[in-house]
């Protein structure tokens, strides 16, 4: 099961809106199709969005059939701008686009064909590096997982949310591979049920014991002493350690704090936005109100009832026990340790 796969001249993208019942791939022949897929959550998860966006730039480059370098550059930069408008919160998107644009600037004197080849190679590198970072994160996170641990996770931060292996689920996978007898509670994650549809499915595919719960049950299973730690992913982390992640994460963190349970965030360095001082500066995406009025095709609320549907919330740094990254585990004080992390090679 691949989240995405480059095939010669186009991108195959697993349609996550069809999971867990149907495994169907979308053929992306241009960046416009990819923009639509990102907006509609057919691909989601900050690292996966970043990798997909890099391939979107490669598609735009490949679709140019002329030889005028200025025209080529304009086409690619338009694609970068279009991709940057798809989702505002996940910082990996902008990190990947800046990386692709930097390559474009470096090679602007090359022939169009050479530029196309370099941009495709860079997109593949973004993808491959993300997978490697996730594997590394899993190894660093192993030390934090006790034997026979009960682990609660929210949303989906697995292979589906990345280029492969996963961030939060990558740590869980690493613990499972190491022979630790762990079990997982997966919040269903309303309104789009990423925990129920994706996390539960991923863990079952890997033979990792998982129990699905509604979001409102999280505090109760903690009180019942069924949870030893919480581990989640992230869409953006600021310089002070504030964390934007799927809506509901903040509530889980508060419950973990109240019950004395460690709350860990697993994320690659590309998810850290040290240009922002705190979570107050993170733009929070608001999505279609129908996502809340419906579950799938079923209407579950009175037609026309007002809805508030932020896709993310911000968990304050003081609720985060530690960050698990591809460069190690970082603990408070985050203003110091996260800057040290950024300087680590």
Curated annotation (Swiss-Prot):
The record marks 155 as: Transition state stabilizer. The keyword Cytoplasm does not apply. Substrate binds at residues 44-46, 87, 194, 245-246. Pathway: Amino-acid biosynthesis; L-methionine biosynthesis via salvage pathway; L-methionine from S-methyl-5-thio-alpha-D-ribose 1-phosphate: step 1/6. InterPro entries: IF-2B-related, IF-M1Pi, IF_2B-like_C, Initiation_fac_2B_a/b/d, M1Pi_N, NagB/RpiA_transferase-like. GO terms for biological process: L-methionine salvage from methylthioadenosine. Gene3D superfamilies: translation initiation factor eif-2b, domain 1 (1.20.120.420), Translation initiation factor eif-2b, domain 2 (3.40.50.10470). It catalyses: 5-(methylsulfanyl)-alpha-D-ribose 1-phosphate = 5-(methylsulfanyl)-D-ribulose 1-phosphate. It is an enzyme of class 5 (isomerase). Signal peptide: none annotated. Pfam families: IF-2B. The keyword Electron transport does not apply. Its EC number is 5.3.1.23. Keywords: Amino-acid biosynthesis, Isomerase, Methionine biosynthesis. The active site is at residue 235. It comes from the Bacteria. Belongs to the eIF-2B alpha/beta/delta subunits family. MtnA subfamily. Catalyzes the interconversion of methylthioribose-1-phosphate (MTR-1-P) into methylthioribulose-1-phosphate (MTRu-1-P). This is Methylthioribose-1-phosphate isomerase. It comes from Heliobacterium modesticaldum (strain ATCC 51547 / Ice1). The gene is mtnA.
